[in-house]
UniProtKB/Swiss-Prot annotation:
It comes from the Eukaryota. JanA and janB regulate somatic sex differentiation. InterPro entries: Janus, Janus_sf. This is Sex-regulated protein janus-A. Substrate binds at K37, S104, Q105, G106. One of its GO terms (molecular function) is protein histidine phosphatase activity. It holds the Pfam family Ocnus. Keywords: Differentiation, Sexual differentiation. GO terms for cellular component: cytosol. Belongs to the janus family. The active site is at H63 (proton acceptor).
Length: 135
């Protein structure tokens, strides 16, 4: 096997590994209850594949704190991350209710309709509302 064939084989293996890493990334990871900031993150493998995920944590003061935390996780998996926007989530598990609203001063407003669709994959029995009102 020549150098080019070895390099090509190695790149295919790396690409396959990053595809598998991307497939293993959960679509939703948010705090179990409360009102907190969230970001939408586009997670990208070594090729052209990507997926949008939602992350929101009550212990993060800023949208950038959420993104920075998750970006480190994705880097360790060989994945890249971009943040198209954020907002806030109100999560009431007793009422099976989620509200997506507001925006991020640093990243701008996420597509709340897309956020709702992604949240519904983890919370199919919840009422999920969106609003462009509020911060």
């Amino acid at each position: 096997m020549n150098r080019f064939q070895l390099l090509s084989k190695g790149l295919r293996l790396i690409h396959k590994m990053s595809e598998e890493a991307l497939a293993g990334v959960p679509l939703v990871h948010i705090s179990p209850e409360g009102i907190f900031k969230y970001v939408m993150i586009n997670v990208i493998d070594g090729g052209d594949a990507s997926k949008a995920v939602i992350r929101g944590f009550a212990d993060c003061t800023w949208h950038a704190d959420i993104f920075d935390r998750e970006e480190e996780v994705f880097k360790k998996l060989g994945l890249r991350a971009e943040c198209p926007g954020g907002g806030r989530i109100e999560h009431n598990p007793d009422k099976k209710y989620l509200k997506v609203y507001g925006y991020s001063q640093g990243f701008g407003k996420a597509d709340h309709a897309q956020t709702k669709r992604i949240l519904a994959t983890k919370y199919p029995d919840y009422t999920i509302e969106t609003s462009d009102e509020g911060y």
